[in-house]
Regions:
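N-terminal catalytic cores of peptidoglycan-degrading enzymes
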Residues: 1-83
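Basic/polar, cationic surfaces and motifs that engage anionic cell-wall
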Residues: 2-11, 16-21, 95-193
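Structural preference for beta-strand elements that scaffold enzyme active sites
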Residues: 26, 86, 145-147
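Cell-envelope and extracellular/periplasmic
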Residues: 33, 70, 80-98, 114-118, ...
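Short polar catalytic/cofactor-binding loops
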Residues: 33-34, 152, 206-210
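Divalent metal-coordination and catalytic microenvironments
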Residues: 56, 89, 109
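SH3-family beta-barrel domains
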Residues: 185-210
Length: 212
């Protein structure tokens, strides 16, 4: 089981189960609730006291960090069952609702999800938008499904901005897996499209964050 070559930074968190106990057939996208780089995002999950992690962090600048290898289960969605079958991705976002992401982060997220699906044998990414239907569905060969943190805990994650883009993400990734090289701008997110990437000076500590 490989990891994405798109990762620009690697810092493995101790917060994980190794190995995962289920094949990868799910993508779970989260909002980080802070405009972090991939490096800073991975650093947040280093203390064992954090009791949380993810497989990848996507930074506001489009950087991608590997935090937990794909062969291992991250601690991300408040559901052991979901985490064992999902690749979890924390995406840099604003710190208030609807938790918008930058255009650079969105583009990197699309690239990363496409790469994950392709390497794990998926030709189609499915978004049902319904917890019961999704959890009852057994992905067929060549399929992966999308789940969200809010289904497993009293959280707003991934925020309405990214949540409203899930259908678009699934369609675009499926299109790319079919051989198309076209890209889609995030036109259906809450309150407009993804923001243009800007430079931030960020000083963050673990206690500052309200991840998920």
């Amino acid at each position: 089981m490989s990891n994405s070559s798109l990762a620009t930074y690697t810092l493995i968190s101790p917060n994980k189960n190794s190995p995962r106990n289920h094949k990868i057939d799910t993508i779970s996208i989260h909002c980080f609730v802070s405009q972090v780089t991939a490096k800073r995002g991975c650093e947040v999950f280093q203390p064992s006291s954090k009791q949380a992690s993810c497989n990848y962090v996507v930074g506001y600048d489009g950087s991608i960090g590997l935090c937990v290898e794909e062969k291992d289960r991250s601690w991300c969605t408040s559901s052991s069952s979901n985490d064992h079958r999902a690749i979890t991705i924390e995406t840099a976002s604003e710190d208030k609702a609807p938790y918008k992401v930058t255009a650079a982060a969105y583009a990197a997220l699309l690239d990363l999800v496409t790469d994950i699906c392709r390497r794990n044998g998926a030709k189609k990414l499915l978004w049902f938008g319904d917890k019961a239907k999704t959890l009852a569905y057994a992905p067929k060969s060549g399929e992966m499904v999308m789940t969200v943190h809010r289904w497993f805990a009293n959280k707003s994650c991934p925020g309405n901005y990214l949540y409203n883009l899930h259908g678009e993400i699934a369609a675009e990734v499926t299109k790319r897996l079919g051989g198309s090289s076209s890209t889609t701008s995030p036109s259906t997110g809450a309150s407009g499209s993804a923001q243009t990437a800007v430079n931030y000076t960020v000083k963050v500590t673990a206690t500052d964050l309200n991840i998920r």
